[in-house]
C-alpha cells in the first residue's frame, strides 16, 4: 500500500519554477569531439512562473568543425476549456484534460577556431497547439491548471548517437 502511495506521489510531481543547472552526469565526454570544453558561459535552463522555459547561451571550444543539434522538449498537462463563439462566451461548452508537448530544435554550426556558439533556446506551453472536438470552438488553457511534468534539454554533436550535454527535470 505504501509503495502505491509513493508511486502516485512521484507520478504527480511537477517541475517547479527555478533555474536548473548541469549535474555531474550532465556532460558525457564520450559523445563529443576529443577536446570539447566550455569556453564561456554555462548551460542552464530557467522554468518561469508561466511554465515557459528559457535555456541560456554559451560557447563550447575544441569542437573542430563539428556541428551540433540542440533540442528543448517540455511535457505539459492542463485542463482545456473550449468556448463557442456564440451567445455565452464566458462559459466553456466543453472541457477536457490534455497532455501536450512543446519542442524547439536547432542546428548549431561550428565557427572558426573550433568554437560552437550555442544560442539561447526557449519553449512555451502557449505556443503548443490546443484542440477542441469542434473546430469552430476556441481552446484555452484554464487558469491554474497548467502543469509542467518534465523537460529535457540536449546538445548532440553530429556523428554521435547520444547527447554531450543533458539537463532534465
Enumerate the language-model features and the residues they cover:
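Sec-dependent, cleavable N-terminal signal peptides
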Residues: 1-14
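Mature extracytoplasmic or otherwise solvent-exposed domains
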Residues: 14-169
